[in-house]
Amino acid sequence: VARNTLQRLFQKPIEWVIAVKLERYYTKEEILSMYLNKFDFLNNAVGIKTAAHTYFACEPKDLKIEEAATLVGMCKNPSLYNPVRFNERSRGRRNVVLEQMRKAGYITDAECDSLQALPLKLKYNRVDHKEGLATYFREYLRGVMTAPKPVKSDYRGWQMQKFYEDSIAWETNPLYGWCAKNKKKDGTNYNIYTDGLKIYTTINSRMQQYAEDAVKEHLGDYLQPVFFKEKEGSKNAPYARSLPEKRVEELLTKAMKQTDRYRLMKEAGASEQQIRKAFDTPEEMTVFSWKGDKDTIMTPMDSIRYYKSFLRTGFMSMDPVSGHVKAYVGGPNYVYFQYDMAMVGRRQVGSTIKPYLYTLAMENGFSPCDQTRHVEQTLIDENGTPWTPRNANNKRYGEMVTLKWGLANSDNWISAYLMGKLNPYNLVRLIHSFGVRNKAIDPVVSLCLGPCEISVGEMVSAYTAFANKGIRVAPLFVTRIEDSDGNVLSTFAPQMEEVISISSAYKMLVMLRAVINEGIGGRVRRYGITADMGGKTGTTNDNSDAWFMGFTPSLVSGCWVGGDERDIHFGRMTYGQGAAAALPIWALYMKKVYDDPTLGYDQQEKFKLPEGFDPCAGSETPDGEVIEEGGLDDLFN
């Protein structure tokens, strides 16, 4: 844009040359079409199609004459003739366009007079990335595509993990930083807002809707009211009753200092006392509720406590072979809870880590049929201190049990037994090989119980190896990108890696199916899920994190549910454990998917194991006999 007369003088001849070239290659209709498809009609409406939806809630072909004239009138100066802000001014401009149409013979005198007499009526529906379907996914995709090349000096000391992850993504993920890596013909970077790019994502709109509906049904309609009721009358609410009041006040004050209101008041020179007084003064505000936004009066400090009371969630579903991400939910509502718990946030994974431990065991010669005595296990930790994990399962105490039984029942003593036979460093290496980027996973003996933090997306990607013969596939969010003319600019293929042997993968499949059919994951069957599947629940200390990972031959999906902070949680496992808080979301989603025949998913689909495959081959029974033939049914029935 020319900023002064001299620049304008130089710009004019260039425009003349461009105009002549355009006229040579395109008709006037084509030129107008290209112009309207790129014009910014304000209010996030770039292009005539988006503008028609934004201002009149219809397709361009369905615009009435006076509506089309309104949009054309905006082209002279969209800010000056903005129909939302300046209705009468925009109406006047519309009538000028109608008059020009009359002069050109597109409408009759009578039509012109009648149309000019009409009021300007809008069906305004602003396009907002914070609303609609797949909001967390859209924002995640925007951040990935517009990411700049990582420069270490741009990251603070506590952001070195992020710098590490961003650097890997820049080098290995062609979608990461796409706008910075790809140039237009004029040498400038692409702009995802104004260049009319067509981005073809892997998200299935119906499956996405089913995922969001499942979250609302379980989290919004059932679990959240139960949580509110549990916290009624507690001075600490929403924090745990056992937490000292002083600690609760510290946490709320910390949250206050992270708000924009606090930052702006601080920048304006307000004292801590003045800021606190403002935060303790009631005011009108609109707040989130699962039944819709509600107007209320409360202090900003109370609003912080109010929003802390809402349980958060992360959910992702993907194809284990193609890597196509079908559904992506990062939280309850993007407008009010913008931190993405699908791909960005990490939480302790609890017992969902145990399949990695058992995989390491299978890779080191163990089999699902190997047995050990079900008793307490004591290991020496990294500090030379004895460590004995607690166990919620005292069934079959003192008996010989199989590893398959141990995983199916998520037994901590059996996990500790395996950890004693293996090496924590090797377990960390294996977890990283499954695509987990968190460098802060400590090689300690307690790692077998899942104290490390991993994202839902990383977990879902990792579990694809169990459904895909030992091959892990990275999440694929976009298949191709085209320019505004339909020219393909980039295509994206699945990124796959064999992380474990096919034999170990089959053995893990056998055990993870047993979690559902014989163990603690059986609750999923109550939802009408009869499919051949494997899975694993997870619950961390004090019910701070609830997990469920489940997979069928065609879909791998994972769900996490928890509070905004670890000290915000259910007091009872009845509601806070993975099988109660996270598993139902997975099950509700899958039931909706299976009930939609147009999606093509069938509960009759089975995992395919090689003919004659014996997961017990090479295993030793208590009397030392080596099992060479027969399968699990021979041993466990």
Regions found by a protein language model. Name each.
Residues 1-6, 58-61, 125-143, 366-427, ...:
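Conserved catalytic neighborhood of penicillin-recognizing serine enzymes
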Residues 13-17, 26-29, 34-36, 43, ...:
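Extracytoplasmic
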Residues 1-170, 179, 186, 333, ...:
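Peptidoglycan glycan-strand catalytic modules in the bacterial/periplasmic cell-wall system
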Residues 15, 19, 23, 75-93, ...:
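Active-site loop and adjoining helix of the penicillin-binding protein/serine DD-peptidase-beta-lactamase fold
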Residues 13, 49, 88-90, 94, ...:
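Acidic/histidine-enriched alpha-helical segments
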Residues 23-28, 40-45, 59-61, 99-113, ...:
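Bacterial peptidoglycan biogenesis and beta-lactam-recognition machinery
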Residues 108-202, 206-270:
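Non-catalytic structural connector segments
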Residues 201, 205-221, 252-319, 324, ...:
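A penicillin-recognizing enzyme superfamily signal
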